[in-house]
């Protein structure tokens, strides 16, 4: 491929879009996967008002907008808005012409097949890209950690999944996915605040709660102990958060009660197993000979794994589940928020990958279903 045709890597998360150029060591732009539309009619004649705002601009004007996320649980639910997000990514953030660059997109495992077909169709027909590829998020995270064997526990805003990979081969029968992730924790946090008498209801206020969650939440090593401590010595746990209007809000036991749902989903009324059990079940679906290596290479990835103590707590929970002689090792790379993107950057700049792209010709010959044949 010629020098100017450097690939674009776009990791479309349910919560954030991470995008940049292949070969870079970090994404060039990261913005929320949000499309906002004005709630009120505009009466200021001459005021430049758009019918919709994307990403940070929507975030900044959120007070007057209704915000929508076009991706829910890793699946695109609104393709028109998704197109706007991609348009914003290429033209406003990266400032490139997509028709000149191959594009690598990412997707959660066990997604409906139509999702990636539609992605392929939009890339070739709307953005006219010369070539594209869709890769599974967890596999890219493993690339980024420099391993070829391990079980990736990826938890983002919309979906969490555990994917065992052995010597570079994904074991599809052992993939587990739970549709519980960061966004569910944000909603849970809103509920916890309501119990305290702080109501956050609008889509804009939800973003404030997300910020509180990201800045102040942590995972308790022992949930019951921590609850006891928060009742007896609440001052040790409480933190003050300043709201955009200058009011102060005290955040106490919510700090660990909110993310505890990752290990105990019944707290938010979900029947799915916790992250540790999901990972354990994935390992148990694998061949008995490779389990030891998987236990020893549990790799965290995604923004919802950024809580303090998550590695230690997961190690503790996995130790309780695994055979007593088993050595458990949880790897929590500091850049794990972006490890999917970093893995995509590594993959798309490998010389051996260049024959993997789906080209425009192949698309024109076979249509969108080509994506199932050429991408895992």
UniProtKB/Swiss-Prot annotation:
One of its GO terms (biological process) is symbiont-mediated actin polymerization-dependent cell-to-cell migration in host. ATP binds at residues 14-16, 18, 157-159, 213, 303. It comes from the Eukaryota. Pfam families: Actin. ATP hydrolysis occurs in the polymeric state. Unlike for mammalian actin, ATP hydrolysis also occurs in the monomeric form and the release of inorganic phosphate (Pi) is more efficient. The modification Tele-methylhistidine is found at residue 73. SMART domains: ACTIN. The keyword ATP-binding applies. Keywords: ATP-binding, Cytoplasm, Cytoskeleton, Hydrolase, Methylation, Nucleotide-binding. GO terms for molecular function: ATP binding; hydrolase activity; structural constituent of cytoskeleton. It catalyses: ATP + H2O = ADP + phosphate + H(+). It is found in: Cytoplasm; Cytoplasm, Cytoskeleton. CDD domains: ASKHA_NBD_actin. Monomer (G-actin). Oligomer (F-actin). Polymerization of globular actin (G-actin) leads to a structural filament (F-actin) in the form of a two-stranded helix. Unlike for mammalian monomeric actin, monomeric actin is able to induce oligomerization with ATP or ADP. Mg(2+), which is used to coordinate ATP, is required for polymerization. Belongs to the actin family. ACT1 and ACT2 differ in their polymerization, filament stability and helical structure. Unlike mammalian actin, Apicomplexa actins do not form long and stable filaments. This is Actin-2. The gene is ACT2.
């Amino acid at each position: 491929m010629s020098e100017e045709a450097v690939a674009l890597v776009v990791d479309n998360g349910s919560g954030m879009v991470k995008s940049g150029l292949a070969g870079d060591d970090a994404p060039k732009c990261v913005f929320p996967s949000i499309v906002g539309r004005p709630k009120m009619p505009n009466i200021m004649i001459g005021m430049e008002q758009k019918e919709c705002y994307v990403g940070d601009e929507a975030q900044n004007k959120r007070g007057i907008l209704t915000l929508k996320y076009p991706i829910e649980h890793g699946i695109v639910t609104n393709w028109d808005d998704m197109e706007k997000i991609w348009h914003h990514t290429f033209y406003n953030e990266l400032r490139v012409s997509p028709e000149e660059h191959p594009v690598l997109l990412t997707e959660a495992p066990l997604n409906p097949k139509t999702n990636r077909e539609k992605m392929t169709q939009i890339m070739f027909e709307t953005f006219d890209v010369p070539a594209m590829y869709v890769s599974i998020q967890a596999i890219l995270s493993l690339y980024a950690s420099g391993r070829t064997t391990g079980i990736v526990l990826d938890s983002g805003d919309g979906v969490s999944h555990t994917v065992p990979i052995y010597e570079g081969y994904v074991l599809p029968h052992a993939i587990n996915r739970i549709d519980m992730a960061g966004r569910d924790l944000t909603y849970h946090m809103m509920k916890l605040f309501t119990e305290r008498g702080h109501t956050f209801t609008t889509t804009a206020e939800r973003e404030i709660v997300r910020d509180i969650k990201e800045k102040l939440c942590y995972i308790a090593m022992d949930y019951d102990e921590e609850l006891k401590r928060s009742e007896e010595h609440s001052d040790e746990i409480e933190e003050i958060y300043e709201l955009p209007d200058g009011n102060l809000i005290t955040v106490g036991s919510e700090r660990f009660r909110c993310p505890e749902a990752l290990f105990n989903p019944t707290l938010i009324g979900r029947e799915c197993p916790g992250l540790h059990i999901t990972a354990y079940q994935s390992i148990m679906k694998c061949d008995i000979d490779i389990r030891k290596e998987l236990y020893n290479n549990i790799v965290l990835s995604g923004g919802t794994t950024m809580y303090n103590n998550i590695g230690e707590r997961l190690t503790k929970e996995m130790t309780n589940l695994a055979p007593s002689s088993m050595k458990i090792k949880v790897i929590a790379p500091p850049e794990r928020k972006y490890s999917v993107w970093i893995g995509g950057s590594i993959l798309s700049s490998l010389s051996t990958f260049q024959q993997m792209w789906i080209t425009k010709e192949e698309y024109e010959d076979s249509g969108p279903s080509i994506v199932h044949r050429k991408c895992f």
